[in-house]
From Swiss-Prot:
InterPro entries: cNMP-bd_dom, cNMP-bd_dom_sf, HTH_CRP, RmlC-like_jellyroll, WH-like_DNA-bd_sf, WH_DNA-bd_sf. Keywords: Activator, cAMP, cAMP-binding, Cytoplasm, DNA-binding, Nucleotide-binding, Transcription, Transcription regulation. GO terms for molecular function: cAMP binding; DNA binding. GO terms for cellular component: cytoplasm. Transmembrane segments: none annotated. Positively regulates the expression of the arcABDCR operon under anaerobic conditions, thus playing an essential role in arginine catabolism. May also control the expression of genes encoding proteins which are involved in anaerobic metabolism. Can bind cyclic AMP. Its main location: cytoplasm. Signal peptide: none annotated. Residues 155-228 form the HTH crp-type domain. The gene is arcR. It is found in: Cytoplasm. A nucleoside 3',5'-cyclic phosphate binds at residues 40-129. This is HTH-type transcriptional regulator ArcR.
């Protein structure tokens, strides 16, 4: 039974490493020699995946689920990153030793592949294709950060909520033709925290959008009409 368990674990790890290889557009054979340095872990909703800088030695590949990464700067400001499956994180400090104060929490049940940050940095130095892919991913990460900040500059609360909804749809939403679906984790309280407004105000705005048939709650999921994007999204 032990042998079967180890075989199953190794097969799972190999499968996820192949998924990572596809994501960064390299042959699996490049990652295969380092399989013993990697791991696959499962996290339940609300569980902390890591808190940097105490746990900043790994890079993670989100295989399944949704996460929130809360980045704290020296002034105490909080920047939130939302991610769904098929994303590599955190990579902003991959090429320099700067410590990042970042709390990563599972918004839903999650599965992640972990590998040493030093290994990924080594692979980038040894392979130009990996470096170019990671550089593009870092730029995408910074663009997401910029879009989130731009949404927060909206003067009116309703515009801020709409732009934040659009931002979430573009980063963690699932394209369903006429609308985007945001799964499970989104709440009025989270929207009010993101927008910096009261829960009551956020709830009133969401209620208006529901009346306009632009937002629909389907059990725990949110369905957001693409018509909401017209002339407001960053």
């Amino acid at each position: 039974m032990t042998e079967n368990f180890i075989l199953g674990r190794n097969n799972k790890l190999e499968h996820e490493l192949k998924a990572l290889a596809d994501y960064i557009n390299i042959p699996y054979s490049i990652l295969q020699p380092y399989q013993s340095e990697c791991f696959v872990r499962h996290y339940t909703k609300g569980q902390v995946i890591y808190f940097s800088p105490q746990e900043s030695s790994n890079i993670y590949f989100l295989i399944e689920g949704n996460i929130i990464r809360e980045h704290y700067n020296q002034n105490g400001d909080v920047y939130r990153y939302f991610n769904k499956e098929q994303v590599l994180f955190p990579i902003s400090n991959l090429f320099h030793p700067k410590e990042v104060n970042e709390l990563c929490t599972a918004l839903t049940d999650c599965t992640v592949l972990g590998l040493p940050r030093e290994l990924m940095a080594f692979l980038c130095k040894a392979n130009d294709d990996i470096f170019l892919t990671l550089f593009a991913l870092i730029n995408d990460n910074e663009q997401q950060h910029m879009n989130y900040n731009m949404a927060l500059t909206s003067k009116f609360a309703k515009d801020r909520i709409i732009k934040l909804l659009c931002h979430l749809c573009q980063t963690v939403g699932y394209d369903q033709d006429e609308f985007y679906e945001i799964k499970q984790f989104l709440t009025i309280q989270l929207m009010s925290d993101m927008a910096g407004i009261s829960r009551e105000t956020a709830g009133h705005i969401i209620h208006e959008l529901k009346d306009e048939k632009l937002v629909v709650k389907d059990h725990k999921n949110w369905l957001v009409s693409k018509h909401l994007f017209n002339d407001v999204c960053v």
